[in-house]
Amino acid sequence: MRITLGSRNPEDRRSSFLHMTASAAATSDSDLNTFADWLEGYYSNRAQAMAEPVWFVPVSLWYVRLPHLFSEGIGFFTEQFNEHTPGRFYRSRVLQVLADPLRIENYKLRDQAAWAGASQDLQRLAQLSLSDLQHLPGCRILVEKRADCYHGQMLPGGGCRLNPGDSTYIHIEFDLTAQEFITWDRGFDATTGQQTWGSRAGPYRYQKRIPVVFPPRP
């Protein structure tokens, strides 16, 4: 499957988002569970990194379901590490997947260091509570069902900032299938619009290694 992400033109991204907004309302609630089942698991982009070592580093990525955390929707804990430095987890955060329309709410951890590596420990994750999180309302991702994947795109306008005073905003878009997660996460200068971090060679292409990381849920 060939998927192309990431127009550099803000107007193109805005037009694409408006199209998604119109179509997302028709998304079935059953897609919430399908999307969550596809997302859950352990991923690696090792094949991509070996093929293009100049542009991509090998990364291990986890999405672990949090059945206890939210009264609505489905929660996930996600984090990753560079496979050259295994165990040094970063970008630990929490997602809330909601229906009607299908979307993702992003949360940062108030104490990032305290939860680094928690994707490997279910008992530890069971202690995670809403008081440990800070909602990032500007970082909502709208998800649209397409013929062979789910496509996600962050709200346009540069509103996703980890801290109110940040001069850089985050833009994320992705395509998800049952076996592949293709994501392009980038930072942009809020004044100039120039990219400040993230891949400049296209999205990271993660292959699912283990469909469900831990034993089946009760």
From Swiss-Prot:
Enzyme category, top tier: lyase
EC number: 4.-.-.-
UniProt keyword annotations, A-Z: Lyase
CDD domains (UniProt xref): CpcT (cd16338)
MF-aspect GO terms: lyase activity
Pfam families associated with the record: CpeT (PF06206)
UniProt keyword Membrane, yes or no: no
Keyword Lyase in annotation: yes
InterPro entries found in the cross-reference section: CpcT/CpeT, CpcT/CpeT_sf
Protein function: Covalently attaches a chromophore to Cys residue(s) of phycobiliproteins.
Entry's family note: Belongs to the CpcT/CpeT biliprotein lyase family.
Record protein name field: Chromophore lyase CpcT/CpeT 1
Source organism of this protein record: Synechococcus sp. (strain JA-3-3Ab) (Cyanobacteria bacterium Yellowstone A-Prime)
Lineage, broadest ranks: Bacteria, Bacillati, Cyanobacteriota, Cyanophyceae, Synechococcales
Gene: cpcT1
